[in-house]
Structures are given as C-alpha cells and as structure tokens.
UniProtKB/Swiss-Prot annotation:
Record-level Gene Ontology MF annotations: RNA binding; tRNA pseudouridine(55) synthase activity
Record key words, sorted: Isomerase, tRNA processing
Protein name (Swiss-Prot/TrEMBL): tRNA pseudouridine synthase B
Organism: Prochlorococcus marinus (strain MIT 9301)
Top-rank taxon: Bacteria
Higher taxonomy: Bacteria, Bacillati, Cyanobacteriota, Cyanophyceae, Synechococcales
Length: 305
C-alpha cells in the first residue's frame, strides 16, 4: 500500500514519548519518512502532529503557536519542575484572591525570558540537558526569550494550592518553568501537576486521532492523513498556470511575476513564504518573493527534475 503524504494529528496518551509515537506510525504505515513537529514530554497528553512522507519538509512552514491547559501545584518544588520529580523543597502558599493571583500571572504574559527546566531536551554543549541532570552534573541553562500570547486563569483552589491555566504560547515555551517561577514570585514553590496540549502547529483536537484508531483500521489509514496543502492554509498561494512555469519551477528556476499583482494584494510579503500550486490546487512547493527582480524564488520544490 502506497502511503499518502500529509499530517497525522495524534492525540498522545500519557507515558508515551514523541519518538515512540513516530516509531509506531512508521510500523503501522510501513514507511520510514515520518517525523514529529516538536517533542511532547512523556507525561503530557494531547496534540502531537506527525508528518508523513514529503510533508516532513514542510514542518518549518506550519504555524508555530501551541495551546495548553495545565494544573500547577503550589508549595512543592521538584528537580524536574513537575510532580513526577524528586521533591527538593516545600513551603506554604498565599491564600490570595483570583484577582490578585491573576495580577501575578501578568508577569508571564507577552515576551518574557524563561530558564528551561534542567530535565529538558535543551542542548547544552552538544548534549541534552536531561542527560546531564540524570548524571547529577552541575550546570546552568541560559534564559531564553519566549512569547506568551494568552494566559488565562481558569480555576484557583486556595485550600489545596492548585490553579488551572490555559496558555497560548510560542514554540520552546515550558509550562513547567511557568509553574516553578510562579511559585518563586509568590514566595512559595511551584510545580506542574498535569498538562494537556489542545492545539499545535495549526491542528487541534477536532483533527486528532489515537494511534489505536489506526491500529483498528490500517486498511483505511489514508483517511486519517490531512493533506499537506490543507495544513498550509495560513500561507498565501500563487498559481502557476502554464506548463512552462511549472517546468521552470521544477528545475529550480525563479518564476517571473507581475510585481503590481503583489503590491495590490496585501496578503503577500517578501519576508513570508508563498505556497506555490498549479491550477488543480496541487502543491508544488514553497517560494519567496524577490521584489527587486519581480521573481518568486524557489525554496522548496516538490517533484524536482
């Protein structure tokens, strides 16, 4: 059975690593060209988009935002910044109102500097931080800039010191770090109790399936795959209308365009990728506009000659 290119939106179960999911999909679809769009910690459940075939080349062009719903437990600090780690300190937490707690959360909204957890996949001197941490090595991670587009306080249980938040953020944001840092701001401690990713890279739960769904219906596995072009709806399209243009494109040559068309159409930006398609809406690749030369220059070409 020939595998269809595109994206599977896996609703990952607890305890399964992102790499485990990729291995299972490779086996189920009998194809090697499979990759995920970003690591989801084993204890985190929810959306894990997986690219199949040529779709792996388009991962960088997907929307990068992600949305989580998480619970934070105040009063506890662990070596992993989540409840599954070793407890290293415990303190009481302030019995403050929802409004006051939301004011403290303001410090995490917008563009912020965040130090990743030491048990994380961040590279330090060519090695993953979690490997150094498991060897009890002493090291520091540098703060990184991340963007929190939305942070909503959904519930606050003063008695048990548990809050539930919804976070829409940039790739590379650690909700565990928010839990840890919120505890410090409140003159307490904090760790992540549980976390669910409800959207990633433009996909959400409505598109999602369990790996068990594929196992039950392998013959119709193609029906679960979202075409690559559908995952790129956020990118402006340019249609190659002649065979000559398509041949130019597939041989890696720039496409001459009427620059007035782009100047009149405000959806195009020379800094942003352009989705190149043919008249039948078949995806041909990704290009970038060169205003000075009135060209679309190929960046990614499918079916190159």
């Amino acid at each position: 059975m020939e595998t269809k290119d595109g994206f599977l939106v896996i609703n990952k179960d607890k305890g399964c690593t992102s790499h485990d999911c990729v291995k299972q999909i490779r086996k189920l679809l009998n194809t090697k060209k499979v990759g995920h769009t970003g690591t989801l910690d084993p204890e985190v459940i929810g959306i894990l988009p997986i690219a199949i075939g040529s779709a792996t080349r388009f991962i960088q062009y997907l929307p990068q935002g992600k949305t989580y719903i998480g619970q934070i437990k105040l009063g506890i600090r662990t070596n992993t910044d989540d409840i599954h780690g070793e407890i290293i300190n415990q303190k009481s937490w302030p019995k403050i109102s929802d409004e006051k707690l939301d004011q403290y959360l303001n410090r995490f909204r917008g563009i912020i500097k965040q130090i990743p957890p030491k048990v994380s996949s961040v590279h330090i001197n060519g090695e993953r931080a979690y490997k150094k941490s498991f060897r009890n090595e002493v090291f520091e991670l540098a703060p990184r800039e991340v963007k929190i587009d939305e942070l909503t306080l959904m519930k606050w249980d003063q008695i048990n010191g548990i809050l539930e938040i919804k976070v829409k953020c940039s790739a590379g944001t650690y909700i565990r770090a928010i839990a840890r840092d919120l505890g410090e701001i409140l003159n307490s401690e904090g760790c992540l109790l549980q976390l669910k990713r409800i959207s990633a890279c433009g996909f959400d739960e409505q598109n999602s399936i369990k790996i068990s769904d594929i196992e039950k219906d392998k013959k119709n596995s193609k029906n679960f795959i979202i075409p690559t072009i559908s995952a790129l709806n956020h990118i402006s399209s340019f249609v190659l209308s002649t065979e000559e243009q398509i041949n130019f494109w597939q041989t890696g040559r720039a496409i001459r365009v009427d620059i007035n068309y782009f100047q009149e159409n405000k959806s195009f930006d020379y800094k942003k990728p352009i989705k190149v398609i043919d008249k039948k809406q078949i995806l041909l690749g990704i290009g970038f506009l060169n205003e000075e030369q009135s060209n679309i220059n190929p960046k990614l070409v499918l079916n190159a000659k």
